[in-house]
């Protein structure tokens, strides 16, 4: 798969502890939105989302350049990648919920 490094990088960012107030594995909603937009939605929508973060124009253009390459992949393949990412993000969020609500529970060990 050509995008394996790109997808692995997204997963690392998704499952990395963003700050001291979030638990490791909790996926930021904004990151989820941008990631799915990056894979599946039109370039114009990605540009709007990136501009919400006040990113430098060079960074926005670099992302759009990669997006143009991604858009050359068949939509069905991109949809499969997006589906896989959604399942992984959901698993990360479920782990966090279980850690919070069942800190010593057997459920957490079952999904590791």
Swiss-Prot record:
Positions of post-translational Pyrrolidone carboxylic acid modification: 21
GO terms, molecular function: steroid binding
The entry's keywords: Disulfide bond, Lipid-binding, Pyrrolidone carboxylic acid, Secreted, Signal, Steroid-binding
Broad class of the protein's primary localization: secreted
PROSITE patterns: SCGB
PTM text: Linked by three disulfide bonds to C3.
SUPFAM superfamilies reported for this sequence: Uteroglobin-like
Keyword DNA damage: no
Pfam families in alphabetical order: Uteroglobin (PF01099)
Localization: Secreted
Claim: Acyltransferase is one of the keywords in the record: no
InterPro entries named in the record: Secretoglobin, Secretoglobin_sf
Signal peptide (UniProt feature, chain positions): 1-20
Assigned GO CC terms: extracellular region; extracellular space
Regions crossing the membrane: none
Subunit structure: Prostatein is composed of three different peptides called C1, C2 and C3. These form covalent C1:C3 (F) and C2:C3 (S) heterodimers whose noncovalent association forms tetrameric (C1:C3/C3:C2) prostatein molecules.
Note: The heterodimer can bind non-polar steroids, cholesterol and a group of small proline-rich peptides.
Function: Part of prostatein which is the major secretory glycoprotein of ventral prostate gland.
Similarity remark: Belongs to the secretoglobin family. Lipophilin subfamily.
Annotated protein name in UniProt: Prostatic steroid-binding protein C2
């Amino acid at each position: 798969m050509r995008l394996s490094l790109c997808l692995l990088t997204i997963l690392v960012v998704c499952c990395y502890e963003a700050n001291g107030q979030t638990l490791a594995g909790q996926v930021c909603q904004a990151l989820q939105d941008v990631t799915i937009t990056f894979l599946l939605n039109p370039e114009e929508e990605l540009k709007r989302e990136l501009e919400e973060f006040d990113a430098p124009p060079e960074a926005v253009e670099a992302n759009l350049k990669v997006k143009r390459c991604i858009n050359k992949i068949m939509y069905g393949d991109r949809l499969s990648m997006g589906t896989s990412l959604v399942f992984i993000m959901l698993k990360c969020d479920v782990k966090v919920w279980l850690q919070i609500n069942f800190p010593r529970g057997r459920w957490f060990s079952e999904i590791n």
